Structures are given as structure tokens and as C-alpha cells.
């Protein structure tokens, strides 16, 4: 459903943000 889609998008954004945060 749409809730799982949003959850997946948030998960991807969180992973990308975490990578950028660790690298900086």
C-alpha cells in the first residue's frame, strides 16, 4: 500500500542522509 511505499522512500532517504553525514 501507499504506507509501505512512503516507508521505503523514508528508509532510502535515511540511508543516504546517514552516508553523507558519516562522510562529512
UniProtKB/Swiss-Prot annotation:
GO terms under cellular component: extracellular region
Localisation per UniProt entry: Secreted
Domain of life: Eukaryota
A Gene Ontology biological process term: defense response to bacterium
Subcellular location, principal: secreted
Tissue: Expressed by the skin glands.
Protein keywords: Antibiotic, Antimicrobial, Secreted
Family (UniProt): Belongs to the gastrin/cholecystokinin family. Magainin subfamily.
Functional summary from the UniProt entry: Has antimicrobial activity against Gram-negative bacterium E.coli ATCC 25922 (MIC=100 uM), Gram-positive bacterium S.auerus ATCC 25923 (MIC=25 uM).
Protein name: Xenoposin precursor fragment B2
Lineage, top ranks: Eukaryota, Metazoa, Chordata, Craniata, Vertebrata
